[in-house]
Curated annotation (Swiss-Prot):
Transmembrane segments: none annotated. GO terms for cellular component: cytoplasm; ribonucleoprotein complex; ribosome. One of its GO terms (molecular function) is structural constituent of ribosome. This is Large ribosomal subunit protein bL36. Pfam families: Ribosomal_L36. The keyword Ribosomal protein applies. The lineage of its organism: Bacteria, Bacillati, Bacillota, Clostridia, Eubacteriales. It comes from the Bacteria. One of its GO terms (biological process) is translation. Belongs to the bacterial ribosomal protein bL36 family. Keywords: Ribonucleoprotein, Ribosomal protein.
């Protein structure tokens, strides 16, 4: 899980979702997991 000020889609399998007011990227590739904050 990378924590970044701006989350970006890295590949076509990445999805941007909102959980509890946080913007997150979920993906099949665990290296692409990101969270904003």
């Amino acid at each position: 899980m990378k924590v970044r000020p701006s989350v970006k889609v890295i590949c076509e399998k990445c999805k941007i979702i909102r959980r509890k007011g946080r913007v997150m990227v979920i993906c099949q590739n665990p290296k692409h997991k990101q969270r904003q904050g």
